[in-house]
Amino acid sequence: MNTALEARNELRRLQAERLDAVEAGLGENALYMTDLDNDIEANRAIYVGLAVTEIATLRAQLGGPQLG
């Protein structure tokens, strides 16, 4: 993933997959659900990191670097 938008879309896809899995009766499959939850948490961290970086980059472009 290169952008926060891509990471957000992947996070939404994983969250939808989790809902679909529960509706399909896979909620009791601990191994699958743990793996999916781990993927969601990892992707959430990637999304936040990319979003913060993009915001900081835009802020620097608009107002110059922060000093002090």
What residue spans do the PLM features occupy?
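Extended, charge-rich alpha-helical interface modules
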Residues: M1-G68
